[in-house]
Amino acid sequence: MAKRKKKKKVAWQSQLTFELVGLGILVIAVVALAQLGTVGETLVRLFRFFLGEWYAVLSIALLVAALYIMVKREKPPLWSRRIGGLYLMLLSALLFSHVGLFGQLQGNEGFSDQSVIRNTWNLFWLDMYGEVQHSDLGGGMIGAIAYAASHFLFADGGTLFLCFILFMAGLILLTGHSITDLFGKAIRRTYLWVVDFIKGTWNEWKQFRKESKEKLEQDRKLLKERKEKKAAKRSRNEDPAQEENDQPLEIVDFSQRVSHEAKNDATVKQQVKPAKQEDQVSKEAPEEDKLASQGQEGEEMPTVSLATAVTPNDDYQLPTIELLKLPNNPNQSMEKRLLHKNAEKLRKTLESFGVKAHVSKVHLGPAVTKYEVNPHVGVKVSRIVNLADDLALALAAKDIRIEAPIPGKSAIGIEVPNQEVAIVTLREVLDSPQAKADRNVLSVGLGRDISGEPVFAPLNKMPHLLVAGATGSGKSVCINGIITSILLKAKPHEVKLMMIDPKMVELNVYNGIPHLLTPVVTEPKKASQALKKVVAEMERRYDLFSHSGTRNIEGYNEMITRQNEKEDAKQPTLPYIVVIVDELADLMMVASGDVEDSIARLAQMARAAGIHMILATQRPSVDVITGVIKANIPSRIAFGVSSQTDSRTILDTGGAEKLLGRGDMLYLPMGATKPTRVQGAFLSDEEVETIVEFVVAQQKAQYAEEMTPTEETKVTEKVDDELYDDAVNLVIEMNSASVSMLQRRFRIGYTRAARLIDEMEARGIVGPYEGSKPREVLVQAQDDEASSH
């Protein structure tokens, strides 16, 4: 009896335990499904951590398990054939959900980490802290682990296929039927429908082909006739230059010029030469009228020099562009064939170093081909820049330059030298539609950029230009191209030139052209004086502007033009003045102080006065291109240099050391953040001589005496300062001269001491100013007495 009671008690306790456990699980399931209170939200977050957006499946499973425990009063089975099928189908759903989540993570810049598990963990904690409103967790951590393993083994495509296989396997285990039993009828019906559709479509296509065959033949005949008519019309009325400009630069070589114009090139030159002698005779009379008219003007305005007021010569004709040679067309077919091959090499080379990127665009330039590379999300630009040598090795290139990034684009430019360099001529640059539409007389042609577009430099907007590069890099050709561009567009009364050529061989060919203010200055000592005269001219112009109430040369010339329309006496307008220094380094060696001061003053103030400078040097060191010069000349052109240090001296950035030479340049205009790579326009000596002969035949040069540097005469007047003789004796005795020394010894002010030093320099006692070094004493003790007279 006691044993029976004990068994009933144990059975009752077991039933009570199952019911209590079932009720507890039921409470958890209901609270989680309804998200009741803080406990419900916590359970939901816990379920989402494991199953992601499929968290409701776990709540439903707990609900079913609770009911099973309370009804059956036994533990629910955790594994069976059907339950295993449900497991596989759930795993397939979790894996598929995480495939979509991984695509979102790749497109989100905020998650650059490639680990799916870490990204899922971060998303879960962002959701926990409330920083993200119900973020998508995909398949939760279970899905993340499954996807990480599947993606590592099978990639994205294999993962999707694995999802399908898991789902089908789970469906088979759940239903207990094979695939044929489940989908056999549907597959057979689909197969029969596809067969019927293909047969019907085939019959309709055969009928359509039969009916349209005759119509197609008729259309071909009509199209052939139209093409023949268009070809005949084009041969009669076609404009070769316009056809060339309409051709896309990406497909056709930019350097190809119309061959029909080359036939007329020699004829044009023969017609131009006889006209030179006639023009030379007809220009003498207007020159006399100029002098007479200039003598009658200037009564209402302050006195203006001949250099600043020139009466226009109505008979002057600008040189025609036909005087320049047509370019020879290089064969770039090999470069075009290598474009796709090199683009694929770039992609594979970057991929071999773990850099995912693709080439989106290619620019075939005259000397360089530029590949635009778009890196994938998460790839640092510095990784591609650091692979410059490896990319050059893969492409078998001499050297490559990387522009990272390209301004205005989300791409990196990789510039690879061409095997065949296409020569860009000045004629094709100045014959472009952009040049014809530009009416600015100071807009000079530089060459073509990598995409084949012509590049122009408006000198009046720069307002000054610094050109630097090693010997043989194309610097002198660039200077000749700038001067020739001005001669082709500007008349002598519009632009005046002052040329300084210490080498005495580069610019002497321009002696005699009417645009010159003075003959080409070849002596370095006279060059310093010439720059001082330009500074004086600038001051005269500003004095003229102040009396006339204008602010710049454009406003003054407009005022003169309006007055000439109302009055009979014609007043001349002011021309622009372009100062060209071919070798700045030689001038800085002879008289660095005076030259730097003059250049600094012109660079700071000469823009409004219409005075612009072009400084060229082949030694881009800091003692030549000083900080004062760089600060006031923002526009620079850098040709090939030997080191990155020289490149930084010119452009404040590297890149010029990787240029190819032969006109390859980096052009940095004022306001630009990065330099533009340009293939400079080539101009032969024969073309320069032809242009100069034409210009000289049109009008003779009229040099301005007040702008011509003269020999410095020795000062003989006595110095009006009682300390001068004592100062000379002190300087000779100490064999050193400085303003501070005179201030200390004689206890005088800076102005008086500086005046004494200037008087000694004017009389040849001490040398010129040399920066921080003391001045050199040029006389001996026995010359002391004579120096004071």
Curated annotation (Swiss-Prot):
Which of this chain's residues are annotated to bind ATP? 472-477
| Subcellular locations according to the entry | Cell membrane
The record places domain FtsK at 452-648
> What is the topology of this protein in the membrane according to its UniProt annotation?
Multi-pass membrane protein
Q: SUPFAM superfamilies, per this entry?
A: P-loop containing nucleoside triphosphate hydrolases, Winged helix' DNA-binding domain
Q: Which Gene3D superfamilies match?
A: 3.30.980.40, P-loop containing nucleotide triphosphate hydrolases, Winged helix-like DNA-binding domain superfamily/Winged helix DNA-binding domain
| GO MF annotation: an example | DNA binding
Q: Where is this region: Disordered?
A: 226-302
- Cellular component per GO? plasma membrane
Membrane-spanning intervals of the chain: 20-40, 49-69, 83-103, 152-172
Q: Does the keyword S-adenosyl-L-methionine apply?
A: no
Print the keywords alphabetically.
ATP-binding, Cell cycle, Cell division, Cell membrane, Chromosome partition, DNA-binding, Membrane, Nucleotide-binding, Transmembrane, Transmembrane helix
Q: What is its main location?
A: membrane
Q: Give the Cytoplasmic compartment stretches of this protein.
A: 173-789
User: May I ask which residue range the UniProt record assigns to the signal sequence?
Assistant: none
- Locations of Basic and acidic residues compositional bias? 275-291
Gene Ontology BP annotations:
cell division; chromosome segregation
Q: Which Pfam families match?
A: FtsK_alpha (PF17854), FtsK_gamma (PF09397), FtsK_SpoIIIE (PF01580)
Domain description from the entry? Answer: Consists of an N-terminal domain, which is sufficient for the localization to the septal ring and is required for cell division, followed by a linker domain, and a C-terminal domain, which forms the translocation motor involved in chromosome segregation. The C-terminal domain can be further subdivided into alpha, beta and gamma subdomains. The alpha and beta subdomains form the DNA pump, and the gamma subdomain is a regulatory subdomain.
Q: What does the record note on quaternary structure?
A: Homohexamer. Forms a ring that surrounds DNA.
Question: In which family does this protein belong, per the annotation?
Answer: Belongs to the FtsK/SpoIIIE/SftA family.
Q: What does this protein do?
A: Essential cell division protein that coordinates cell division and chromosome segregation. The N-terminus is involved in assembly of the cell-division machinery. The C-terminus functions as a DNA motor that moves dsDNA in an ATP-dependent manner towards the dif recombination site, which is located within the replication terminus region. Required for activation of the Xer recombinase, allowing activation of chromosome unlinking by recombination.
Q: What is this protein called?
A: DNA translocase FtsK
Protein's organism: Halalkalibacterium halodurans (strain ATCC BAA-125 / DSM 18197 / FERM 7344 / JCM 9153 / C-125)
What is the gene name? Answer: ftsK
